[in-house]
């Protein structure tokens, strides 16, 4: 079950964290994985690790916020079956403390970046007889996160795009779903703690973990496992749906 043999998958934000875990798992399940990330060095490291595991993988440095670059990337990759829109950035701030520049930056990557990938990928998926799109939303789209105004807004848009795409391209054989993670222990979290709480990283990590009802953060591999299911033939009857993976966060905050 959950095999991706003979499938080609494009994964944005694949250089670290959740995207890296998805790329590694998809490759282990037989897919030819195209890892896309703004950080070329991170891409190459993922490629090395996947090839050491005998996986098929190609790396691409690309800024998803630049439509022309994304279009060229998709054309260069050629026919593919799966698109995972995972690239994104975070920002801390309320509506009145978020600058226009920061708001635009978050929207450019988290919303326009997804749009750019959809715009370039859907014609290829349609021509290929269909495929699967998986967008990375967030619990922030469901409940809003305190002092994450721009991020919550952007992820709400991603969830809306998921619904729209699922409806518009159902007859083309394209399925589209999204995942809404809660807190996930990624290098981003470690970097955030190191920058903001030097010397107190372990203490603050424990505090952040306790904000999750289940008592810990998710691991990237857990999110990747859900992504694999949704992109496999076993999920062929599922489209237009968001899947929280949040340790009970949404249930206890709505």
Which residue ranges define each predicted feature?
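C-terminal helical subdomain
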Residues: 66, 178, 186, 200-234, ...
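Alpha-helical segment proximal to the catalytic Tyr-Lys
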Residues: 123, 167-171, 236
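Residue(s) in the substrate-gating loop at a strand-loop-helix junction
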Residues: 138
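Short C-terminal tail/terminal secondary-structure segment
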Residues: 143, 228, 239-254
